[in-house]
Design a protein with these regions (language model features):
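Metal-dependent phosphoesterase/phosphodiesterase active-site architecture
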Residues: 1-16, 21-30, 34, 38, ...
Length: 201
């Protein structure tokens, strides 16, 4: 599907929606998943995926554009564009964790103080007391991290796409709105713009 979409001149943007994450700065939460980094990130690079939207973690955070991985056991995603708010996705894929749509267990207060990441490397034997397999984690630095909402447990992202003109670029403006208070006060907390050349160039 990714190959067909990227080869279609009528499609500019490729957005992947999935549950678990390749990136997360949550501590004592689910964390990032090595299996996703091994199996999915190379596909996202190969087919120039623009944006990956995940849940699983119950907070909001955003990565720099990433392409490839650093030479670590955890396959740390490699940030390729230091621009925090205007990102050319032809250089790399931006990852969003949007997990604050409504949960009884928010994780925004469980983020590492500095950008770090726990990566699920494998699972061990079944623990009869819990009925679950024991997860094995490795902690790493998170150079890919650009924005984390530590204050607000609930929120959503609105996207506005401008197709642009033939032969030029197309843009996707995104705004993360935090929702708080007993009356659902909505406040913009993070804004960024993705750009890419149109495929009809």
């Amino acid at each position: 599907e990714l190959e067909r979409s990227r080869g279609n001149k009528d499609i500019d943007w490729i957005v992947v929606c999935m549950h678990q994450t390749a990136v997360s700065t949550g501590n004592k939460t689910n964390g990032a998943d090595l299996g996703i980094r091994e199996n999915w990130l190379p596909l996202f690079d190969r087919f120039n995926v623009d944006l990956v939207v995940c849940g699983h973690e119950h907070h909001y955070e955003r990565s720099h554009a990433i392409r490839g991985t650093l030479p670590t056991d955890t396959l740390t995603p490699n940030p390729v564009d230091a621009q925090p708010d205007s990102i050319d996705t032809s250089k790399g894929t931006v990852h969003l964790v949007i997990g604050g749509g409504g949960t009884s267990i928010p994780s925004n207060t469980m983020l590492f103080p500095e950008p770090r990441c726990r990566v699920l490397m494998s699972v061990g034997e079944l623990n009869p007391a819990t009925g679950r397999k024991t997860p094995n984690y490795i902690e790493e630095a998170a150079p890919w991290s650009v924005f984390r909402d530590r204050e607000n447990p609930c929120g959503f992202v609105a996207f506005d796409v401008d197709p642009g003109r033939p032969g030029a670029s197309t843009t996707m403006d995104a705004t993360y709105y935090a929702v708080s208070g007993p009356f659902g006060e909505v406040r913009a907390v993070d804004r960024f713009r993705l750009t890419r050349p149109r495929t009809d160039r």
